[in-house]
Amino acid sequence: MIFDVKAPILGFETIHKMHLQKIDEIFLRLNSAEDNSVVSFTLVNPFALRKYEFEVPTPLKILLELEGAKSVLVANIMVVQTPIELSTVNYLAPLIFNLDKQLMGQVVLDSKKYPHYHLRENILSHTHE
């Protein structure tokens, strides 16, 4: 599914279209959908790994047309390592997808408001919660 990027991924502000592909119930692949770009991210379903909740800022709700949206997906960027147990997840800057309207964006959470989320957390750090 191709998404219009309404709130860019930090460091990738020039990418305006992304292709999201589900791998399984936990992992997804996000690739640039533009001819001049070869950007790819591995994403993870945070709810499969830990208790995870945050408030979406109003400006992002408006940009992504989340009011009344029936299908919203939250995913986090993962840095894959070998072995997989060394991989890290960015819980402080989730990606939000409006599946109904094919809109997406990244929100950077306030670390003071969410001190229990970090930019690089080991993928296994919350598996026993």
UniProtKB/Swiss-Prot annotation:
Primary localisation category: cytoplasm
GO biological process: bacterial-type flagellum assembly; regulation of translation
Swiss-Prot/TrEMBL keywords: Bacterial flagellum biogenesis, Chaperone, Cytoplasm, Translation regulation
GO cellular component, one term: cytoplasm
Keyword Chaperone: yes
Pfam families: FliW
Compartment(s) where it occurs, according to its Swiss-Prot or TrEMBL record: Cytoplasm
Stated family: Belongs to the FliW family.
Assembly: Interacts with translational regulator CsrA and flagellin(s).
Job description of the protein: Acts as an anti-CsrA protein, binds CsrA and prevents it from repressing translation of its target genes, one of which is flagellin. Binds to flagellin and participates in the assembly of the flagellum.
NCBIfam families membership: PRK13282.1
UniProt name for this protein: Flagellar assembly factor FliW 2
Species whose genome carries this gene: Helicobacter pylori (strain J99 / ATCC 700824)
